[in-house]
Amino acid sequence: MGFRIVDNFLNQKSLDNLSKKFNLLKKDNIPVMWFEEDYNNNVFLKEASKIYDFSKYKGFEQWSHNNTQCDPHIDKDEGYFKKTLGKLKFPICSIIFYVEVKNLKGGQLKLEDDTITPKSNRLVIFDPGIYHSVEKFKGTRRTYLINPWNYKPKTFNYETI
């Protein structure tokens, strides 16, 4: 199992801009959305492309967790999983960016046998097919999540954004 952690990933201005967007959401989350754009135009995807093969990249899905719990799961094509009654297809990798972490008790990211402590401005990129979850927590824990794909997942059967 592989993962990479990059601390202080964004410069302060970029981090502040992302934090402002989260503040506007209040307690809501960014809904899961599909985008088809060059990965070189997205700092998170560009970083992931340094360690994962993006030669067949088609687009990415993004969403957020704004102080929300995450039960154990594997990032997968949910539409394909439902349609095939349990078969799995995975993204290129999974990307978690900690936008804001304050006064946190608990809330560690569990990657099978590894535990990662959340920290503001921390980027975590990990291999596809890994069970992961978030321990119960109190405090502020805001994350921005991205899954890049080599195809458009069956989950997204509407128009491309």
What spans do the regions from the language model cover?
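Catalytic core of non-heme Fe(II) oxygenases with the double-stranded beta-helix
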Residues: 56-161
